[in-house]
């Protein structure tokens, strides 16, 4: 379980539920993302929640948690998602009439970016209503994430990026990303300063940016524009990439496995009215977890294709992992891979590598099975448990319901490629959030 890597030091693979629980919960304060992780991410993600530790992380999590409440779901989130689902439907309807082959994953990224920007920043970036507009931000952000991911296996990346093509493209991508966040923050700051306290009602709708702009430290200081921009980009990774990737993998499994597709279609059909019309397309937040066919397929998708397939922590002090685990020395890196754990028969049984949504359904009650957050670790665990897991789950259930109630989709021929026992596999690129 231990390795030594140049530039990184001693690395311990802790891809076991009991060891991950120790690192992420039992002895949480001893394991941090660390300065090296922060240094590799700083030029893009700054001091945001994705890269931070300690008090800085606690503050951001506390503020962000205030948007993920039941009242926010009912007042803001469900309506936004429904509106964007209708725009997705309109686009697919156009493609269907024209007989056009389209990129479903690209559409999912437009959907999650649009809905998250509306929820978090109250802005419509028109990615769905004007889909032919160049997605300069998305392309730049994707490239930046790819480079950030590569840095983990390139100890001399700082020197190399000064002179190579990757560094030149990275600087150009970073400039585009910074302009995107600058526009959001500066426009809101000007509006807030102009309106004064009138812009901060005690009641009424507040988005994530409102909450962070309203934050004051113990000495009364507000967050700087740079801190707000860091916050935006970190939340963007969580709100755009992870859900779009899960939707893509889920749809791929549905369209390549007739039994999965049929089960979801049966569930959809039972919830539509007699004419199969709009009344059955909108799912209330209070009951979305009753859609067990879609929810279990989503969970099985996340199990085999976790949004964060690998992660690390650095030990601040000496320690010993439980249940006969190795000794940990100060400075050691803990590596865990949810992707590898999902395929481990000691954790998930002899059928670990199979795509089986049924493992998430209780045969007697028909309800969803709850696994330990350190076994089903795709939403993280302990104090860093994903704040947006309910948002992502609702978003996926609602959009899949909306699309497949109206359309029969087919994959285009993927060619003869093989991987990991599958006859055909989709193309994808590495990033911080993609396996």
From Swiss-Prot:
Pathway: Secondary metabolite biosynthesis. Signal peptide: none annotated. It holds the Pfam family p450. Induction: Expression is strongly induced under conditions of nitrogen starvation. Expression is positively regulated by the cluster-specific transcription factor rua1 that recognizes and binds to the specific 5'-T/G-G/T-C-G-C-A-T-A/T-C/T-C/T-G/A-3' upstream activating sequence found in all promoters of the UA biosynthesis genes. It is an enzyme of class 1 (oxidoreductase). Gene3D superfamilies: Cytochrome P450 (1.10.630.10). This is Cytochrome P450 monooxygenase cyp1. It comes from Mycosarcoma maydis.
């Amino acid at each position: 379980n231990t390795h030594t890597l140049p530039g990184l030091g001693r690395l311990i693979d802790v891809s076991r539920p009991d060891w991950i629980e120790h690192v992420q919960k039992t002895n949480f304060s001893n394991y941090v993302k660390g300065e090296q992780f922060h240094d590799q991410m700083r030029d893009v993600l700054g001091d945001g929640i994705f890269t931070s530790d300690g008090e800085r992380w606690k503050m951001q999590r506390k503020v962000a948690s205030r948007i993920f409440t039941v009242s926010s779901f009912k007042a803001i989130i469900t309506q936004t998602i429904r509106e964007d689902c209708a725009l997705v439907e309109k686009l697919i309807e156009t493609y269907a009439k024209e007989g056009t082959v389209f990129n479903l994953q690209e559409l999912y990224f437009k959907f999650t970016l649009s809905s998250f920007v509306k929820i978090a920043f109250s802005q419509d970036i028109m990615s769905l209503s004007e889909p032919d507009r160049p997605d300069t931000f998305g392309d730049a952000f994707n490239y930046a994430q790819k480079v950030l991911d590569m840095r983990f296996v390139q100890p001399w990346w700082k020197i190399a990026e000064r002179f190579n093509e990757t560094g030149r493209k990275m600087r150009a991508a970073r400039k585009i990303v910074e302009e995107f966040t600058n526009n959001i923050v500066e426009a809101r700051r000007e509006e807030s300063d102009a309106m004064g306290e009138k812009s901060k009602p005690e009641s009424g709708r507040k988005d994530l940016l409102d909450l962070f702009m309203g934050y004051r430290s113990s000495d009364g200081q507000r967050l700087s524009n740079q801190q707000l921009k860091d916050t935006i980009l970190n939340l963007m990774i969580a709100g755009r990439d992870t859900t779009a990737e899960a939707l893509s993998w889920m749809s791929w499994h549905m369209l390549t496995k007739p039994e999965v597709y049929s089960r979801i279609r049966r569930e959809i059909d039972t919830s539509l009215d007699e004419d199969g019309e709009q009344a059955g397309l909108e799912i209330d937040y209070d009951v979305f977890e009753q859609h067990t066919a879609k929810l279990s397929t989503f969970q099985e998708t996340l199990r085999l294709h976790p949004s964060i397939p690998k992660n690390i922590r650095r030990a601040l002090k000496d320690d010993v992992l439980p249940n006969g685990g190795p000794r940990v020395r100060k400075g050691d890196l803990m590596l865990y891979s949810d992707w590898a754990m999902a395929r481990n028969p000691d954790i998930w049984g002899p059928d670990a590598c199979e795509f089986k949504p049924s493992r998430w359904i209780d045969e007697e009650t028909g309800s969803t099975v709850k696994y330990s957050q350190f076994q089903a670790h795709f939403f993280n665990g302990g104090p860093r448990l994903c704040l947006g897991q309910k948002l992502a789950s609702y978003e996926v259930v609602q959009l899949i319901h909306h699309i497949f109630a109206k359309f029969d989709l087919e994959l285009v021929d993927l060619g003869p490629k093989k991987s990991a026992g599958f006859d055909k596999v989709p193309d994808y690129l590495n990033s911080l959030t993609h396996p």
